[in-house]
A protein has these predicted regions:
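N-proximal low-complexity "stem/linker" segments adjacent to membrane-targeting elements
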Residues: 1-28
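Cell-envelope/extracellular polymer assembly enzymes that use nucleotide-activated donors
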Residues: 4-7, 35, 174
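A conserved acidic beta->alpha catalytic loop
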Residues: 32, 40-49, 91
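Short beta-strand/loop segment that forms part of the nucleotide-sugar
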Residues: 34-42, 64-67
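Glycine-rich, basic loop-to-helix element that forms the pyrophosphate-binding segment
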Residues: 65-82
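Short aromatic/hydrophobic "clamp" motif used to bind/position activated sugar donors
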Residues: 87
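Conserved donor NDP-sugar-binding/catalytic core segment of glycosyltransferases
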Residues: 95, 99-129
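Conserved nucleotide-sugar donor-binding catalytic segment
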Residues: 134-216
Length: 251
């Protein structure tokens, strides 16, 4: 294992429209002790050509391209290849802020399991909204930070055998919850770590996908009354999706 501090993992599949912006945000980081691994799922567009452009500019970029079982399978491949002490998962249509990784490392301690911060939500009309991460204690029933707004110790991801592929949309929540329940030590910084485009799979309302929250709470025994907590969270999600989001789009 090398002494690289942060391994940035980006899963791609036909991501050419947005990938260049994501990779540029990595290059523009004030924090420079990183590697960036692109895990591609046999893209049919020019995703790999873009990746190779960045590899030619900077040896810290590298990639693999092979069939996978979805984004969390790609994420698992990524951490297994990673050489860094910390793992950061960046969406292929998202950006890490210029000082994002520096801000996280500024609050790092030897005992920390996860370092996390806030985010900017970027909407399809180009507008953005600052979104504060939830307190870590809420990890028992919801994903307190977005996975793009946090870094996790690689040793803990390995200890938990990575992402559970039974979860198509909430595997990041499942893994992060397991780490929280077993190891604790989530450290927060009130800084924006990422800019996230609000068009991803986890941002689309699909009740079957939301049921994964109930399944993982039961699996991890994270709350005393999982069904009650599930409906409490889902009510808030419904209000946000059907009332608050349309109001934002009308502004």
């Amino acid at each position: 294992m090398s002494n690289i501090k942060i391994s940035i993992i980006i899963a791609t599949f036909n991501s050419a429209k947005t990938l260049r912006v994501a990779l540029n945000s990595v290059m523009l980081q004030t924090f420079q002790d990183w590697e960036c691994i692109v895990v591609d799922g046999l893209s049919k567009d020019n995703t790999l050509e873009i990746v190779k452009e960045f590899e030619a500019k900077d040896v810290r970029f590298h990639h693999i391209s092979e069939a996978d079982k979805g984004i969390y399978d790609a994420f698992n491949k990524g951490w297994k290849l990673a050489k860094g002490e910390w793992i950061y998962y960046l969406g292929s249509d998202d950006q890490v802020t210029k000082n994002g990784l520096t801000d996280l490392m500024d609050v790092s301690t030897s005992e920390a399991s996860v370092l996390y911060g806030d985010m900017y939500a970027i909407f399809e009309d180009g507008s953005e909204r600052y979104v504060k991460a939830h307190p870590a204690k809420q990890m028992t029933y919801l994903m307190a930070p977005s996975h793009q707004g946090m870094i996790t110790r690689r040793t803990l991801i390995e200890a938990e055998n990575g992402f559970d592929l039974q979860f198509r949309v909430r595997a990041d929540f499942d893994l992060t919850q397991r780490i929280y329940l077993k190891y604790g030590n989530f450290i927060y910084t009130p800084k924006a770590i990422t800019k996230c485009l609000q068009t991803g799979l986890s941002n689309q309302f699909n009740f079957k996908h939301h049921l994964e929250r109930l399944t993982l709470m039961r699996k991890n025994n994270s709350v005393r009354f999982p069904l009650l907590m599930f409906w409490y969270v889902e009510w808030k999600v419904l209000v946000r999706h059907w009332i608050l989001k349309p109001l934002h789009l009308r502004k």
